[in-house]
């Protein structure tokens, strides 16, 4: 019963869309109405408000970290509990019950989850994102590369033997890549927006 309650709680935590909440609190347009229409930090940055983008990034990462940390802190379900909380909070961000199941792509939330699973895993994955983003200026490309490397880092650190958390990390990576399928098409067509590019007028 504890595992079930923790999983549901993790999903509800994940369902809080900071992109929408922060934008509303700061009097900005709903991020689902412009740019990529994705309620995430990168799209909020297209509004031109860096503070809102940073708050969105921190909030989305924090909720991922919090959901997993709470399960680990109270020892709920061991590694299975951690794996379920990780998947649940991630799915909450992707399909938030509070916002008609229209959520973001999960990059910041996944980063928070990985930091809670193990700081080295989270930092290695975040560093991968930063390196790709710095050199290529594409948030989506950085996310895709980080998603590919996250399971590899996890296996390198912890191995694969009877490790439900490794499967959770792999599942998040697959989901994150799938959520970026439109970005993949734009990258291949040379039409993807670069980091910091503002929303188009009337978009």
Swiss-Prot record:
A single Gene Ontology CC term: plasma membrane
EC number: 2.3.1.275
Family matches, as Pfam families: G3P_acyltransf
Membrane topology listed for this record: Multi-pass membrane protein
Cell compartment(s), UniProt: Cell inner membrane
Catalysed reactions, semicolon-separated: an acyl phosphate + sn-glycerol 3-phosphate = a 1-acyl-sn-glycero-3-phosphate + phosphate
A biological process from GO: phospholipid biosynthetic process
Pathway this chain belongs to: Lipid metabolism; phospholipid metabolism
UniProt keywords, alphabetically: Cell inner membrane, Cell membrane, Lipid biosynthesis, Lipid metabolism, Membrane, Phospholipid biosynthesis, Phospholipid metabolism, Transferase, Transmembrane, Transmembrane helix
GO molecular function: acyl-phosphate glycerol-3-phosphate acyltransferase activity
Known partners and oligomeric status: Probably interacts with PlsX.
Physiological role: Catalyzes the transfer of an acyl group from acyl-phosphate (acyl-PO(4)) to glycerol-3-phosphate (G3P) to form lysophosphatidic acid (LPA). This enzyme utilizes acyl-phosphate as fatty acyl donor, but not acyl-CoA or acyl-ACP.
Family statement drawn from the similarity comment of this UniProt entry: Belongs to the PlsY family.
Protein name, entry field: Glycerol-3-phosphate acyltransferase
Species, as recorded: Burkholderia pseudomallei (strain 1710b)
Source organism phylogeny: Bacteria, Pseudomonadati, Pseudomonadota, Betaproteobacteria, Burkholderiales
The gene coding this protein: plsY
């Amino acid at each position: 019963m504890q595992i079930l309650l923790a999983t549901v709680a993790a999903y509800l935590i994940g369902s809080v869309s900071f992109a929408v909440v922060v934008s509303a609190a700061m009097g900005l347009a709903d991020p689902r109405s412009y740019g990529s229409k994705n309620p995430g930090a990168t799209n909020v940055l297209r509004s031109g408000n860096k503070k809102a983008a940073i708050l969105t990034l921190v909030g989305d990462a924090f909720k991922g970290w919090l959901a997993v940390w709470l399960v680990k802190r109270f020892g709920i379900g061991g590694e299975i509990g951690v794996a379920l909380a990780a998947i649940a909070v991630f799915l909450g961000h992707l399909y938030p019950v509070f916002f008609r199941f229209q959520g973001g792509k999960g990059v910041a939330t996944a980063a928070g989850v990985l930091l809670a699973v193990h700081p080295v895993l989270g930092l290695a994955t975040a560093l991968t994102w930063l390196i790709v983003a710095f050199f290529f200026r594409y948030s989506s490309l950085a996310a895709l590369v980080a998603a590919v490397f996250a399971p590899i880092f996890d296996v390198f650190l912890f191995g694969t033997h009877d490790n439900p958390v490794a499967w959770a990390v792999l599942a998040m990576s697959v989901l994150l890549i799938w959520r970026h399928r439109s970005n993949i098409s734009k990258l291949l067509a040379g039409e993807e927006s670069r980091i910091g590019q503002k929303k188009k007028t009337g978009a």
